[in-house]
């Protein structure tokens, strides 16, 4: 729920200069609804694969973002694999920990924050909604709407 609560915490908060929602899940009140009122630059990271638990709709959150937003889908990444309890998962033998996608996510987050908060042009691509990278899919416009499950009325 951390990604969704980051969005809720940024709502009407003048101290917030950037928001990162990593694998945001469903929240109450709705982070998707709150995103419609956030002008702060945002980074929303979702999975490049279907989640069997349907924890949330990161693409819909990004689609509803009022201000500038970057949506990134990480290949083979998921909410379940992005965890800090790596040692426990390794000790009990679960294969849920995803070191590659986790490192990609950390890199995207760091670059986005450096570009946005430090206004560092070296990292400008990390804040570009259409930037591409290996094992990362960036979606905007109609592609983002399709991933979000949003359709226009005919």
Which ranges hold each PLM region?
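Sec/Tat-exported extracytoplasmic proteins
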Residues: 14, 23, 116-117
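Alpha/beta-hydrolase-fold serine-hydrolase catalytic core, especially in secreted/extracellular enzymes
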Residues: 76, 85-154
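The feature captures the conserved acid-bearing segment of alpha/beta-hydrolase catalytic domains
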Residues: 17-84
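Gly/Ala-rich beta-loop-alpha elbow adjacent to hydrolase catalytic centers
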Residues: 1-6
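Conserved hydrolase catalytic core segment
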Residues: 8-17
């Amino acid at each position: 729920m951390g990604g969704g609560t980051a969005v809720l915490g940024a709502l009407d908060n003048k101290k917030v200069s950037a928001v990162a929602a990593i694998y945001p899940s469903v929240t109450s009140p709705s982070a998707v609804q709150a995103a419609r009122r956030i002008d702060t630059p945002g980074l929303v990271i979702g999975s490049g694969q279907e989640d069997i638990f349907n924890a949330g709709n990161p693409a819909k959150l990004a689609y509803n973002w009022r201000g500038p937003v970057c949506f990134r889908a990480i290949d083979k990444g998921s909410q379940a694999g992005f965890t800090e309890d790596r040692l426990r998962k390794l000790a009990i033998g679960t294969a849920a920990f995803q070191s590659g996608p986790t490192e990609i996510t950390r890199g995207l987050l760091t670059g986005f924050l450096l570009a946005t908060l430090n206004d560092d042009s070296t990292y400008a691509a990390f804040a570009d909604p259409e930037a591409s990278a290996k094992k990362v899919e960036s979606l905007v416009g109609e592609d983002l709407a399709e991933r979000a499950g949003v359709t226009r009325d005919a």
